[in-house]
């Protein structure tokens, strides 16, 4: 479990919520005022920012990109730890087996490793494919998997771009309604709330959810696996 990711979210949202709740007493002291939290909850703003961002992502990416979200969250919060030394020992072990018992003996040993990339590599060797061709095939597979990982992180980077944009759309909607109903004092504050809160939602969604997920996912794929295999 990656406690740093959990801690980052807790600290981030915690600081924001506490800052919203903090009020100042007449004597200059600070106190928590729960009623202040109501001003930051606005259903139309939520619909504009969250609904608009999801809709834009639906237009931009196929369904399989959304289906991968649980898998990506698992990688971020529960990353697998790999020991490079273990892979070196496995390769040396397979090399010794091939030298003593022949290449075909490696087929029975493949069950001892769970890494798909390593298994595929050994199978290519067992099939007596030329070394240059094996190297070419493996490099091509690595390039394909790396490109797929780039596309996976692009989903969240795009989300971090769309969220503030829809926050600005909500701000424009609120300002238009505000200017169109200046004589109606009952809706004046509501339209102003929509104008400001949507920007707030968009910035939070982009900089505390989408962009951190994209950066952490990229880091996990680069540094916590021996090969881009997921």
Where are these regions (language model features)?
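Glycine-centered small-residue hotspots that permit tight backbone geometry or close packing
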Residues: 128-129, 167, 229
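Conserved small/polar residues in nucleotide/adenosyl-binding loops
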Residues: 223-230
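Large intracellular
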Residues: 3-4, 8, 18-152, 225
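Residue-level marker of positions within ordered structural domains that often coincide
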Residues: 42, 197, 230
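Helix-termination/interfacial motifs at the ends of transmembrane alpha-helices
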Residues: 2, 7-10, 14-31, 144-220
């Amino acid at each position: 479990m990656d406690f740093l990711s959990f801690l980052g979210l807790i600290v981030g949202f915690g600081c924001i919520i506490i800052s919203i709740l903090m009020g100042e007493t007449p004597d200059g002291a600070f106190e928590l005022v729960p009623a202040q939290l109501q001003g930051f909850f606005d259903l139309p703003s939520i619909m504009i920012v969250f609904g608009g961002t999801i809709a834009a992502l639906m237009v931009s990416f196929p369904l399989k990109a959304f289906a991968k979200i649980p898998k990506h969250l698992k990688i971020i919060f529960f990353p697998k730890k790999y020991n490079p030394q273990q892979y070196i020992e496995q390769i040396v072990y397979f090399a010794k087996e091939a030298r003593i018992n022949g290449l075909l003996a490696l087929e029975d040993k493949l069950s001892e490793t769970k890494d798909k990339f390593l298994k595929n590599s050994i199978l290519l060797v067992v099939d007596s494919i030329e070394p240059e061709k094996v190297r070419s095939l493996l490099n091509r597979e690595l390039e394909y998997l790396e490109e797929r990982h780039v596309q996976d992180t692009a989903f969240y980077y795009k989300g971090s771009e769309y969220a503030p944009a829809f926050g600005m759309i909500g701000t424009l909607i609120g300002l238009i309604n505000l200017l169109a109903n200046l004589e109606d004092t009952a809706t004046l504050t509501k339209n102003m709330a929509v104008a400001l809160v949507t920007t707030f939602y968009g910035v939070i969604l982009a900089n505390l959810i989408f962009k951190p997920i994209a950066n952490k996912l990229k880091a996990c794929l680069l540094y916590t696996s021996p090969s881009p295999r997921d």
